[in-house]
From Swiss-Prot:
This is Exportin-1. Belongs to the exportin family. SUPFAM superfamilies: ARM repeat (SSF48371). Its main location: nucleus. Receptor for the leucine-rich nuclear export signal (NES). GO terms for molecular function: GTP binding; nuclear export signal receptor activity; small GTPase binding. One of its GO terms (biological process) is protein export from nucleus. The lineage of its organism: Eukaryota, Fungi, Dikarya, Ascomycota, Taphrinomycotina.
């Protein structure tokens, strides 16, 4: 096999064929050897020179593909280094092979795959050579296409690929200037290409040529001037000639969809309407509106199903861009006809098609709602010259009946859409009970992200539909519920989708209407729960009751009796053993507790005491059938209620009563342990202790700063237990070795330690009196925890220690500065030793370690200046190691630490900052340039760019006043600016010998000049990186910042818009009102 690696003699192509065949068809060691040899062959810098021989002589297709991939690599990375004659020779050879394999129809079909790869290689050459070194390419390919039908077919594919490379994929593969030049060239020479396409589509009879030309036209349509579309006959031509032909209709309607997506000046409106009428006439003849689309889709071929999906895409694209001209009276018939088609398509049981339709429905109802909002109240009722409150309009649709609103055009369409949305409603994430593939009702354990996203979109549409006609929405929902209750439409699916839809419109009705509607719904559901027999039926109804009530906190807050009834019903469900019911009852309870907390601690009219008193009194009975995790949720829910009690002495009493049971268990075990330490050897005791601590964590999480009396009560015993447990673990490890840390007993003991740490963390992160924390909690905590962490074997160290210290540093900030050396002595060196051996061991410690470093740098920076120089050097080394890490999160943390450290140092006095930069500037610069040009670290581009710009600025602005070089090694006129230029030049020339020195020199001058303009600096940096052969592959991550900014801006705009629409943000997701925080 190694014979193919002998580049000093002619390649044995037959041997290469056998090696490739072994790789693809062999097994075991022989296959691995073939893989190794082929990898070496492809990596060899002279491998491309064998491509001609391989393409001419090889008998095995995969071998030819390898030859083309080697050529592709040459073209994309070293093309400019080749002499002009060699470049011309390769280009002419590729063209010749392409013509040879595409001029004959039989050969074209046989060599289709090879030819496709050959076309891609030609396009890579075009990106390098055209137009400057190949100015006649477009005229040549157009002329050649007229000589031979099969050659013409392949040329269409080449033109399509070239268009895709320039207009679709260029952003992340070529520099900005190169992309702009190629786009201008393509547009400038398009007339010839368009004329060729038109001639083919008018005259050709060969199906594969027609399909290839339509496919190529499809790629042109999103960038060519509109004159080519509407000032020629191309639309009529493709619609009349190809839309009704099964073989061509999919690619034809894709072309029409691309045209429909274009936005234009009003002068083309009539052209768009004419096109739409043409298409809908064909659609009505091919697929009559009366067809049962759901059934027809199920029975259709793949080609026919694709057409229905493409029709949905066409309708949605056209409506999204050109709806208003269709709303003119003369076009309303075709408008409503087309919307009826879209409604029928929306009923098809295919999620991807429904999502296409949903995107348009969402736009339509949002537009109609916004128009409605802009009508002044004075136009609806001159007596009320006020701005229009949404709830008044929503609850009085008749007020709008006489106004010229667009929503009136769509009245029947919107009424049907309400039913379609209800029938298709997907499961909200709060619902834990689902029907599995076997038709059984079970608890769902894995949430589907796609379903959650789809639910949010459907919910938005239903909220808008409610505002557009609240009366019709109520009628549609109550009539459907009535049919379910009487049994004519009873099914789990029908009840689920209806209740999910009812829950989704919470907040969209005014309070009076919501009350009437919801009272009827909940009464019907409670009656259904009593009426239905069978555990599965009851579980389905129960889950829907819980979901609906959980979505309407405003209603519950306004109707105390109903709230109390609902909560007592939840307590009943907590004794129901059907899978998922108890979980959902607890989740709904905590949701209601968060949103209605004040109502539980206030004494309501007609009650003898606040409801929280009764809940705590019956706590043991209510939670007796719950799992420990569910019980913790219950305690957390009670904590939210207690946090709303404004009177401190009453709040403390409630906390005392709430924690009575866990405190009793705690005190019993602590008393026993004081008498006999062996108690902690009992697994059941360990389990009880862990559970008690987790209960405390749950309550502390929701009660917050007010939990101090409970913390203080058990704090000394807790730290004593921490030490005792740690001693037991050490004894077991000493006796049994490291393996002991994996045993159930030691794992149980470690859980106790972790929960103690989590409890302290939970309290300190919410504490308000930080001096009290610093003076009373921290000294004893550090005494118990730090030395223990240092002395433990690595496998017995808990990452929670690092998390807790990070919380303390973030909370106490400069109050903790004097204790940072103590902290670093205990946790820094030993943790660094654990995580620096590789990139994978101790992942939790790894993440926590760097988060701690960042917290210290941000909050207690002066402490870092006072640690010994060797330890400080270790800190710097660990930061560098973190941003060279393979984990994205750790890379990002490391880069943030470095940027913040550089800024901190630059803000210090010259003595401190100069000393730091003189020691570390050059090594840090080298490390940043390393990760910047390394393909495994592309995700850090944004922060790498900011750090580099900051480092350059410090030199260019003379903020560093000491030499960054050894003055004895350089002439007297040397300065930092000149040294930096030379240093970066030498570094890059050495690292990337394939780049011309002039390229590197221009890059260095540009980025140094742009160090204060972060956007231009980043663009220049990105263009340079794309040129690097080592930086090949997918460069999408270099654009991550723009994508993140765009997404953040979209999310912000969506949130601001949603806040203006009642019900658009779920009441349970709304920020808690001030009154609830009392």
């Amino acid at each position: 096999m190694e014979g193919i690696l002998a580049f000093d003699r002619e390649l044995d192509v037959a041997l290469l064929d056998r090696v490739v065949q072994t790789f693809y068809q062999g097994v075991g060691a022989e296959q691995q050897q073939a893989q190794q040899v082929l990898t070496q062959f492809q990596a060899h810098p002279d491998a491309w020179s064998q491509a001609y021989s391989i393409l001419e002589k090889s008998e095995y297709p995969q071998t030819k593909y390898i030859a083309l991939s080697v050529l592709d690599k040459l073209i994309t990375t070293r093309w400019k280094m080749l002499p002009k004659e060699q470049r011309l020779g390769i280009r002419n050879y590729i063209v010749a092979v392409m013509i040879k394999n595409s001029s004959d129809e039989t050969v074209l079909q046989q060599q289709k795959t090879f030819l496709n790869k050959l076309d891609l290689t030609l396009v890579q050459i075009l990106k390098q050579e055209w137009p400057h070194n190949w100015p006649n390419f477009i005229p040549e390919i157009v002329q050649a296409s007229k000589t031979n039908l099969s050659l013409c077919e392949n040329n269409m594919i080449v033109l399509r690929l070239l268009s895709e490379e320039i207009f679709d994929y260029s952003a992340e593969q070529m520099t900005q200037l190169k992309t702009k030049n190629l786009k201008n060239q393509m547009c400038g020479e398009f007339a010839e290409i368009f004329q060729l396409c038109s001639q083919i589509l008018e005259r050709a009879q060969k199906p594969s040529l027609i399909k290839a030309t339509l496919g190529t036209l499809l790629r042109f349509l999103n960038w060519i001037p509109l004159g080519y579309i509407f000032e020629t006959n191309i639309v009529e031509l493709i619609t009349n000639r190809f839309l009704n032909v099964p073989d061509f209709r999919n690619v034809t309607i894709e072309c029409l969809t691309e045209i429909a997506s274009l936005t234009s000046q009003p002068q083309y409106n009539d052209k768009f309407v004419t096109m739409f009428n043409l298409v809908m006439t064909s659609v009505n003849s091919m697929l009559p509106l009366q067809t049962d689309f759901r059934e027809a889709y199920e029975e259709s071929s793949t080609n026919e199903q694709d057409f229905i999906q493409n029709l949905a895409l066409f309708l949605c694209a056209f409506f999204s861009s050109h709806l208003r001209p269709l709303e003119n009276p003369e076009n309303q018939e075709v408008l409503l006809n087309a919307h009826s088609y879209l409604l029928n398509i929306s009923r098809i049981n295919e999620r991807e098609i429904f999502k296409i339709c949903l995107e348009y429905w969402s736009k339509l109802v949002a537009q109609l709602y916004e128009e409605m909002q802009q009508i002044p109240m004075s136009e609806m009722n001159p007596l009320l010259n006020l701005s229009s409150p949404t709830s008044l309009i929503s609850s009085n649709p008749n007020m709008l009946a006489n106004l010229p609103l667009r929503k009136h055009i769509y009245k029947d369409i919107l009424s049907t859409l309400r039913l379609v949305m209800i029938e298709n409603m997907v499961k909200p994430e709060e619902v834990l009970i689902v029907e599995n593939d076997e038709g059984e009702i079970v608890r769902e354990f894995v949430k589907e992200t796609d379903t959650i996203t789809l639910y949010k979109s459907m919910r938005e549409v239903l909220v808008y539909l409610t505002h557009l006609d609240v009366v019709d929405t109520e009628i549609v929902m109550t009539e459907k519920l009535a049919r379910i209750v009487v049994g004519t439409e009873w099914s789990w699916q029908n009840l689920n989708t209806l209740c999910w839809a009812i829950g989704s419109i919470s907040g969209a009705m005014n309070e009076e209407m919501e009350k009437r509607f919801l009272v009827n719904v909940i009464k019907d559901l409670l009656g259904l729960c009593e009426m239905k027999r069978g555990k599965d039926n009851k579980a389905v109804v129960a889950s829907n009751i819980m979901y609906v009530v959980g979505q309407y906190p405003r209603f519950l807050k306004a109707h105390w009796k109903f709230l109390k009834t609902v909560v007592n019903k939840l307590f009943e469900f907590m004794h129901e053993y059907h899978e998922g019911v108890q979980d959902m009852a607890c989740d709904t309870f905590i949701k209601i507790a968060q949103k209605c907390r004040r109502h539980f601690v206030a004494q309501q009219l007609g009650e003898t005491e606040p409801f929280i008193n009764e809940i705590i009194r019956n706590l043991a009975k209510t939670t007796e059938d719950l799992t420990p995790q569910q019980t913790h949720t219950f305690y957390e829910a009670c904590g939210y209620m207690i946090s709303a009690q404004p009177q401190k002495h009453l709040q403390e009493r409630l906390i005392f009563d709430l924690m009575a049971l866990p405190n009793q268990a705690w005190e019993n075990i602590v008393a026993q342990a004081a008498q006999n330490a062996q108690v902690l050897g009992d697994p059941q005791t360990v389990k009880i202790l862990a559970n008690v601590l987790k209960t405390n964590v749950a309550a502390c999480t929701s009660i917050g700063s007010g939990f101090y009396p409970q913390i203080a009560k058990n704090y000394v015993d807790m730290l004593g237990l921490y030490k005792a447990v740690s001693g037991l673990i050490s004894e077991v490890v000493a006796a049994q070795g490291n393996i002991a840390t994996k045993t159930p007993h030691v794992r149980g003991l470690r859980t106790i330690k972790k929960e103690i740490l989590k409890l302290v963390d939970a309290y300190i992160s919410r504490a308000e009196d930080l001096e009290l924390v610093g003076n009373t909690l921290i000294p004893a905590l550090f005494e118990a925890v730090l030395l223990d962490y240092l002395q433990n074997v690595p496998d017995a160290r808990d990452a929670e220690v690092l998390n807790l210290i990070t919380t303390i540093v973030n909370q106490l900030s400069e109050l903790l500065t004097d204790k940072i050396p103590l902290v670093l002595d205990a946790v820094f060196g030993c943790t660094l030793e654990m995580i620096s051996k590789d990139f994978s061991e101790y992942p939790e410690h790894r993440a926590a370690f760097f988060q701690l470093l960042r917290a210290i740098n941000l909050n207690c920076f002066p402490a870092l200046l006072n640690i010994p120089a060797p330890q400080f050097k270790l800190v710097i080394n660990s930061i560098v190691w973190s941003f060279k890490h393979v984990s994205r999160d750790i890379q990002e943390t490391g880069l943030n630490i470095l940027l913040e450290l550089i800024n901190n140092m630059a803000s210090m006095g010259p003595d401190v900052s100069n000393a730091f930069f003189q020691t570390y500037y050059i090594s840090l610069l080298q490390d940043i340039l390393y990760v910047l040009t390394d393909s495994d670290h592309k995700s850090g581009f944004k922060l790498q760019s900011l750090i580099l710009a900051r480092l350059f600025y410090l030199v260019e602005s003379n903020q560093i006043t000491v030499p960054l070089y050894d003055p004895s090694q350089f002439p007297q006129e040397m300065n930092n600016q000149l040294f930096l230029r030379q240093y970066i030049m030498n570094l890059l020339v050495t690292a990337f010998p394939h780049l011309q020195p002039i390229q590197i020199q221009e890059f260095v001058q540009t980025v140094l000049a742009l160090n204060q303009d972060s956007i231009k600096f980043k663009l220049a940096l990105r263009d340079f990186l794309i040129q690097l052969k080592e930086f090949g592959g997918d460069n999408a991550e270099l654009y991550l910042e723009e994508k993140e900014q765009e997404l953040a801006a979209q999310q912000k705009a969506q949130l601001e818009k949603a806040m203006t629409v009642p019900g658009m943000i779920k009441p349970v997701d709304m920020p808690t009102m001030e009154e609830e925080e009392l």
